[in-house]
């Protein structure tokens, strides 16, 4: 039987560890067994039990304190991840060979691990050799994404990971529970956006002609091919968490031997997929 994995990615502070913690609790409520593996050698603490912790293999602080290496924080992290890639047997021993595993990998936030280095791609390939079906879960902070240009920046980061890893990817806006009512209403247009409309709304802020020329084809690429879209993740709302989990399960065909339902928004194409969610939040 296949095994299943989520690679939980995103910038520092986007809520990766919180996502892992709340998703584990949500799955436990559904009587589903989910484990977490910490792959951030610079992590200080997290609010969930782990089945494996990369810090047992190597830690950033130890690398930075090594006088023969003399790495800073970023260099130390890269060294740790490259060392990890050369010691996948450690991870294999930690994971064991249990069928039907479902594991969340809490990954580091540095974008260069996905754009410039082969480490995460090598991890994906190794997991696939171990018969894992892997889905990327890319997180961005919804509070950061309420402005058009920041949203485009978040899209480029998500797109970089998607292209580099070549696996199904679900993109999520986290910390929806921290937004004001006004911000929640504003952010709905960013979940399944019309990129050309967003560009038109913000052209007055584009002072550089070169920047305008760059932004327009980027928006066109995303819009024409429907390459990036986002789901809202509100850890205080079970329905929001369930929608996210349904999309991920659908991407990796979790429980394909069971009767499976497609994510809810496919059932009613004529209406916005999150109209009900936002209406409930605005009425609170």
Curated annotation (Swiss-Prot):
Small GTPase required for proper localization of RNA polymerase II (RNAPII). May act at an RNAP assembly step prior to nuclear import. It holds the Pfam family ATP_bind_1. Disulfide bonds: none annotated. One of its GO terms (molecular function) is GTP binding. The record marks 74 as: Stabilizes the phosphate intermediate. Heterodimer with GPN1. Binds to RNA polymerase II (RNAPII). Interacts directly with subunits RPB4 and RPB7 and the CTD of RPB1. This is GPN-loop GTPase 3. Belongs to the GPN-loop GTPase family. A motif (Gly-Pro-Asn (GPN)-loop) lies at residues 72-74. Transmembrane segments: none annotated. The keyword Lipid metabolism does not apply. Keywords: GTP-binding, Hydrolase, Nucleotide-binding. Residues 261-284 are annotated as: Disordered. The lineage of its organism: Eukaryota, Metazoa, Chordata, Craniata, Vertebrata. GTP binds at residues 13-18, 174-177.
């Amino acid at each position: 039987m296949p095994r299943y994995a989520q690679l939980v990615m995103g910038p520092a502070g986007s809520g990766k560890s919180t996502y892992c913690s709340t998703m584990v609790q949500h799955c436990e409520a559904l009587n589903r067994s989910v484990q977490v593996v910490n792959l951030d050698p610079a992590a200080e603490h997290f609010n969930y039990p782990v089945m494996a912790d990369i810090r047992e293999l190597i830690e950033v602080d130890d690398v930075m304190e090594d006088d023969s290496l003399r790495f800073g924080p970023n260099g130390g992290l890269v060294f740790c991840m490259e060392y990890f890639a050369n010691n996948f047997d450690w991870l294999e021993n930690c994971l064991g060979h249990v069928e039907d595993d479902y594991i969340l990998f809490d990954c580091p936030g540095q974008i260069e691990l996905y754009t410039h280095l082969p480490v995460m791609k090598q991890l994906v390939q190794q997991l696939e050799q171990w018969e894992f079906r892997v889905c990327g879960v890319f997180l961005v902070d919804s509070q950061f994404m309420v402005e058009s240009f920041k949203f485009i920046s978040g899209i480029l980061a998500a797109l970089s990971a998607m292209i580099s890893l070549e696996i199904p990817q679900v993109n999520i806006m986290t910390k929806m529970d921290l937004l004001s009512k006004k911000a929640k209403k504003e952010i709905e247009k960013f979940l399944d956006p019309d990129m050309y409309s967003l560009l038109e709304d913000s052209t007055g802020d584009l002072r550089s002609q070169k920047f305008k020329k760059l932004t327009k084809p980027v928006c066109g690429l995303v819009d024409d091919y429907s390459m990036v879209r986002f789901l809202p993740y509100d850890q205080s709302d079970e329905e929001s968490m369930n929608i996210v989990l349904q999309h991920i399960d659908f991407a990796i065909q979790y429980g394909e031997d069971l009767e499976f339902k497609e994510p809810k928004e496919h059932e009613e194409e004529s209406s916005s997929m999150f109209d009900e969610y936002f209406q409930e939040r605005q009425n609170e």
